[in-house]
A protein has these predicted regions:
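Charged helix-capping and loop-helix junction motifs
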Residues: 82-83, 130-139, 160-164
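Core dinuclear metal-dependent hydrolase active-site scaffold
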Residues: 1-42, 49-118, 126-133, 176-199
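Proline-aspartate-enriched helix->loop->beta-strand connector
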Residues: 40, 118, 134-151
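Accessory terminal helices/loops
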Residues: 144-145, 149-199
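Short secondary-structure boundary segments
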Residues: 47, 123, 149-151
């Protein structure tokens, strides 16, 4: 499968099973990113904020996928400040792909996502968990491939978010790619840093 990054928390998973879009953003909702025009078979949105719920930006030809959900919170206060958040667990080409959405809290039961193949996790803080908390999750989950998201990079992203610099300093298995990476059962354990969003 190929994983394409469109910036922020938006990814396209595409391959023999079809195309799934995670957390597409509304036009103008994120500094430095353009309007999305995507095609897919399923759109998964972690919550209903404009930078994660642009279903109308995706032309959908419906297809069924195996998707599990874990309901969490967007903050450390049981959702009282920013609401709820959904972790999506997609089974794709016999691999487990986990998108953490805008998770803003630590959860105890990680059994459904332990040792997943791909983990997409926010690191920018303020609206979500920060780098320290993300690293704690990674240590507990032990994913094969880690993809950080929801951080500031150059002119792209919210000013209040941290960059990925601290996160990179704490990872030893960095693999830099442009905006897409191909993943299969043989892909080695690594942390993927996308250099520039496709959008």
């Amino acid at each position: 499968m190929k994983i394409i990054w469109y910036g922020h928390s938006c990814f396209e998973i595409t391959g023999s099973d079809g195309t799934v879009i995670f957390d597409p953003y509304q036009e103008g909702s994120i500094p430095g990113l353009n309007k999305l025009h995507l095609k897919g078979n399923l759109v998964l949105c972690s919550h209903e904020h404009d930078d994660h719920n642009a279903r109308d930006c995706v032309d959908v030809l419906p297809k069924e996928f195996k998707v599990e959900k874990i309901e969490t919170y967007h903050d450390h206060h049981l959702g009282s400040r920013r609401g709820k958040n959904t972790i999506h667990i997609l089974t794709y080409e016999n691999m487990k792909v986990v998108h953490m959405g805008d998770i803003g809290c630590m959860i105890d039961d990680l059994s459904k996502i332990k040792n997943c193949d791909v983990l997409m996790i926010p690191i920018g803080g303020y609206y979500t968990i920060d780098t320290k908390e993300a690293l704690e999750y990674i240590n507990q989950i032990q994913p094969r491939i880690v993809i950080p998201m929801h951080y500031r990079s150059g002119d792209v992203g919210y000013d209040v978010l941290s960059t990925n610099e601290e996160f990179i300093k704490n990872r030893k298995d960095i693999c830099y790619v442009k905006d897409v990476i191909e993943v299969n059962q043989e892909t080695q354990k690594q942390t993927v840093i996308f250099e520039k969003p496709r959008n």
